[in-house]
Amino acid sequence: MGHSIYLADDEKSIRELLHSFLASDGYTVHSFESGDALLEAFRQEPAELVILDIMMPGTDGLTVCRELRSVSDIPIILLTAKDSELDYVMGISQGSDDYLTKPFRPTILLMKVRALLRRVEMDRGKTAAAVDELHYGDLRYSATENAVLRGNTPVALTQTELRLLSYMMKQPEKAYSREELLNAVWGFDSEVETRVTDETLRRIRKKLLHAGSTVSVSTIWGFGYKLKEAERT
């Protein structure tokens, strides 16, 4: 039996199309026409990945995403009919791992599903060999506490933000390309078009500033990003 996926979309035609497409690739798919139904099923038996339409009657996808993220770090993909920057930012801020704007090709969704589940498997394999602590500037990553801390205070990061920042802290002076970060943190191939790296790092930069950290995320135009310890005067 393949990985279990929960899918919620109030549009029956889309729900049935995606269900059939994912099931044909070997996944065990359970479809729901509302966010409330998905949440109820998840409480009984958690899935390994969730796909959510944002605009659903009743409990919308953003709320469901927030509820799921409060109890689980499973991969979450949001779907929306709006090509809205606000929807994208809201989705990432609620803890989603990626985002697709309708209409989209089912093959793109399948690539993202495969990549996210591959990342989960990679994370499990790395757990035993994981570094217990990392330090850069006034930041400390603790595997035991599953957090990045400034002093004794955790920086308020989502699990995806934590994975990304801790990955960059392993070699903080290194310049990371978007492609490397996509592969290392999300498991995506460089051909998968996504804004998720840029948006996640923008949020990390904002949160580090809010925490008063000397560490910031520096943009290397045309290439990617690196961590930088700011000079304090």
Predicted feature locations:
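His-Asp phosphorelay/catalytic-motif detector in bacterial-type signaling
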Residues: 2, 46-48, 71-75, 191
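Basic, amphipathic DNA-recognition helix from helix-turn-helix-like DNA-binding domains
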Residues: 66, 70, 75-135
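Charged docking surfaces used in two-component/phosphorelay signaling
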Residues: 16-24
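Short, Lys/Arg-enriched segments at the junction into DNA-binding effector domains
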Residues: 4, 115-175, 179, 228
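Short hydrophobic/Thr-rich beta-strand motif most characteristic of the beta2 strand and flanking loop
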Residues: 26-33, 41
